[in-house]
Amino acid sequence: MSSTILVIHGPNLNLLGKREPEVYGHLTLDNINQQLIAQAEQASITLDTFQSNWEGAIVDRIHQAQTEGVKLIIINPAALTHTSVALRDALLGVAIPFIEVHLSNVHAREAFRHHSYLSDKAIGVICGLGAKGYSFALDYAIEKIQPSNPN
């Protein structure tokens, strides 16, 4: 395995499959992670996953990614999307490109969910496509970090 991609899941995503399945779907976080790991393995990419309900732990994991040589971060910051300058600063501080993912369409929900502290710095934002959004983000990430085929 060559390059590394880190997938970060924010607060309450450990409750996937139980919490508001009509909004977030029926897959568990473990289901999603296993699908992503298998998808990355097919491309000979190392994929690490991390979930925390604690903002500081997520910031620490972002900092750690820089020392590990992570090439790209896929992050679902969950509720921290709308509140965390610390996450924004951590992502900018490590200068690792990132894709922001949301299971639900945050723009079709409550007004307070419409603003993201990360979107303007992300290389892309995917929302409203459920767990497939992670898969689409990973497809793009793999394409972005793998060397071009010279043929």
Curated annotation (Swiss-Prot):
GO biological process, any: quinate catabolic process
Residue sites binding substrate per the record: 76, 82, 89, 103-104, 113
Source organism (scientific name): Acinetobacter baumannii (strain AYE)
Family: Belongs to the type-II 3-dehydroquinase family.
Site (Transition state stabilizer): 19
Catalytic residue positions: 24 (proton acceptor), 102 (proton donor)
Cited CDD domains: DHQase_II
Purpose: Catalyzes a trans-dehydration via an enolate intermediate.
Pfam families in the cross-refs: DHquinase_II
Protein name: 3-dehydroquinate dehydratase
Alphabetic keyword roster: Amino-acid biosynthesis, Aromatic amino acid biosynthesis, Lyase
